[in-house]
């Protein structure tokens, strides 16, 4: 079903305004914006509430690192790969030609070696799809799709964590918040969707917990998006998210697993924690010298400066 752009625009415009510079004390005023939450903003808060405050509330600039530059360029290249891949053309090729074809769809730049790793992976995936007569599932049904939705976060109570001495907390009321995100890819296998996240850094086993939170955020986003938003991104409302996946080509690591409700619960709890920080107007630091030393806000963070001089 093709969505008319004016219908999609009207759907988005009908949602409440949203912002990171949110004031919970004004929530009852219908003219005031609600809280905007993305996978990145929630991940930053989980990593360090103070960094979230610097980046999203105060909107202080960050230095662009080589990792950021690489991520942007390689994400664009992978998006273009799927836009340009011709199933009918590839079906007539030999295995060697399929690899050459996949390689040819990537640009020539500083990351050619990384692209070749991806080309090998994608060529083998297509060869396997050919053998199983599943080339119709090779391309993603959604390639860099934008999703928006509104969800209600109950007042609680919520279990606390190490961040607040494991004390339970409650919000002052239920809140509607706006979730937004761009999902790299969504594939369909059988009767289920599989969101897949593309990462350009190196895989470490400790990252699995964070990846599950990221993918659970996307599942919540898809599950709560309207039919128009889903169809605009290429998805059908009656097909559920059955699995999620992530791909780290630099480490030749790919993982796919059944989606887990407990990870969604963890994300919802983190959103409640974020709202609680806004209510308390308190965004505490999580100082750890090995990671904080690379933070763009190291020079203005009181916790970092105090620890440095100890």
State what each model feature region is.
Residues 1-23, 292-293, 297-300, 306-308:
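Accessory/regulatory regions of helicases
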Residues 6-35, 45, 49-60:
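N-terminal structured helix/loop subdomain that forms the ligand-binding/catalytic interface
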Residues 31-33, 49-62, 100-105, 192-201, ...:
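Short amphipathic alpha-helical segments and their helix-coil junctions
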Residues 35, 39-87, 115-124, 144-145, ...:
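Nuclease catalytic cores
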Residues 43-53, 75, 85-105, 236-250:
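Short, compositionally biased low-complexity segments
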Residues 73-167:
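A non-catalytic, helix-rich entry segment at domain boundaries
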Residues 148-273:
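Mg2+/Mn2+-dependent nuclease catalytic core
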Residues 262-299, 303, 309:
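Polybasic (Lys/Arg-rich)
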